[in-house]
Amino acid sequence: MDVTAKIARFVVDTKYETIPSKAIETAKIAVRDCLGVALAGSKEEDAKICAEIARQEDAKEEATVIGQGFRSSALQAAFANGTAAHAMDFDHSFTLMGQPTAPIIPAVFALGESLGASGRQILEAYTTGFEVTGKTRLFAARQQA
């Protein structure tokens, strides 16, 4: 099985019940942190520009654009919210992993909102995305060494 297939299998096989409780508690903190940072960042110029692009798109109102008072397509909401989450550079970081939460949470929330996902499903998706990010970065670091 190649690396891509292994990652896909891991994503498909991961269920909320299999995620350690410590990881879930840490994920809850990270989600709250990211949403707070995105709300603050939504007032920054770059985030406002991305939000305006999302507003101009003639799209279904699938997901909230944080701090802007409107909804857009899941794609545009994820883009605008991801920009807002990074805008003030307050997102947490890890030496090897960079800043995985700010790109993951906006995508997970936008898609989750558009599909009617539960809180458990949001946490499952976030922790799975975080784990995949960490493992792929570790793999890449070993390949470069």
Give the role of each language-model region:
Residues 1-145:
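N-terminal core-entry segment
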